Amino acid sequence: MEEPSGAQLLGPVEIRALAEKLDVTPTKKLGQNFVHDPNTVRRIVAAAELTPDDHVVEVGPGLGSLTLALVESAASVTAVEIDPRLAAELPETFQWRAPALAHKLSIVLKDALKVQQSDMAVQPTALVANLPYNVSVPVLLHMMEEFPTINKVLVMVQAEVADRLAADPGSKIYGVPSVKASFYGPVTRAGSIGKNVFWPAPKIESGLVKIVREDTAWKQDDETRKKVWPIIDAAFLQRRKTLRAALSGHYGSGQAAEEALRAADIDPTLRGEKLDVTDYVRLAGVLQQKDEK
C-alpha cells in the first residue's frame, strides 16, 4: 500500500529481500545496522523538524529506509555511502518505492570522513542520519566542520554516545565530544530508539541527538578550531588532573598554564570537565592575545 505522501517505506520483508538480492551482510566493520521499522523512520524525520526548503545530507543510507522518508520532507537529499553495492542499489529502490521523488536524490560514493563541499551539487542545510556506530562522533564533527551551511542536525547513535554528546559540564560522562559538539550550538537528547527496530538487532540501545547551529561569539572556522581543539584534547587527556597540570604540556609549563587560565578568569585548580565551550574558547583567545604581543 502506498504511503499517503508518495513513498512506500521499507519494512522487515523488504529489507531482508534487498539484503539477499545484494548479498549484503551487515558488518561491524562498517557499523551497519539497518532500520526496518517505518514508524521509527517517521519519528526520526519528525524530530528533525525539516522544512520543504531544506537540503539534507544523510550519511550511511544503507538500504534506504530513512532516505525514502527524508525525500518527502525536504527539497533534496544527498546520500553519502561508502559501500558501492548499496550506493548502486539506492536509485533502483527509489524507482521501486518512490518513483515520483527519485529526482530529489543524489548519491556520493565516498567515505563520509573524506567528504568535501565540492562533492555536493547543493550545500546541505541539515544532517539527518543513522550514523555508522564505529565512527559516529568523528563523522558528526567532520560534517559540522566541512559544511557551515548545516544549521540543524538529528542523528541516531549508540545510547551511551548520545548521552556523552549531550552531557553538561560537571557530569562524569562530559568530555571531548560534548565540548566539541557544543562549539556549534546547543546539543540535546531527542529520544531513545530500541534494539528491535534494527536488523541485525544491536546489543545496545540507540539515542537521537539534536544540534541546532547558532551564531556564536566566536567564528566557527578552521582557524578557531585549530586554537581551541588542542586545549580541549589536553584538558581531558588526563581528566583527573587539574587544568594547571593537564595543560602544562600545551603551554610549556605549569606556571604558564596557570597564568593563561587566570588571564581567562578560570580557576587553575578546576578540572577540564567543569568548563563549558565558552571557557575553552576564551582560554584559546588568551593564548592568541599573547602570541600577538
From Swiss-Prot:
Residues the record lists as binding S-adenosyl-L-methionine: 33, 35, 60, 81, 111, 130
Keywords assigned by UniProt, alphabetized: Cytoplasm, Methyltransferase, RNA-binding, rRNA processing, S-adenosyl-L-methionine, Transferase
Alphabetical list of Gene3D superfamilies matching this protein: Ribosomal RNA adenine dimethylase-like, domain 2 (1.10.8.100), Vaccinia Virus protein VP39 (3.40.50.150)
SMART domains on file: rADc
Pfam families named among the record's database cross-references: RrnaAD
Reactions catalysed: adenosine(1518)/adenosine(1519) in 16S rRNA + 4 S-adenosyl-L-methionine = N(6)-dimethyladenosine(1518)/N(6)-dimethyladenosine(1519) in 16S rRNA + 4 S-adenosyl-L-homocysteine + 4 H(+)
Any one GO molecular function term: 16S rRNA (adenine(1518)-N(6)/adenine(1519)-N(6))-dimethyltransferase activity
Claim: Secreted is one of the keywords in the record: no
EC number(s) stated in the UniProt entry for this protein: 2.1.1.182
Top-level taxon of the source organism: Bacteria
Group of enzyme by EC: transferase
Localization of this protein: Cytoplasm
A GO CC annotation given for this chain: cytosol
Family, per entry: Belongs to the class I-like SAM-binding methyltransferase superfamily. rRNA adenine N(6)-methyltransferase family. RsmA subfamily.
Chain's role: Specifically dimethylates two adjacent adenosines (A1518 and A1519) in the loop of a conserved hairpin near the 3'-end of 16S rRNA in the 30S particle. May play a critical role in biogenesis of 30S subunits.
NCBIfam families given in the database record: ksgA (TIGR00755)
Protein name per Swiss-Prot or TrEMBL: Ribosomal RNA small subunit methyltransferase A
Organism: Corynebacterium glutamicum (strain ATCC 13032 / DSM 20300 / JCM 1318 / BCRC 11384 / CCUG 27702 / LMG 3730 / NBRC 12168 / NCIMB 10025 / NRRL B-2784 / 534)
Gene name, Swiss-Prot/TrEMBL: rsmA
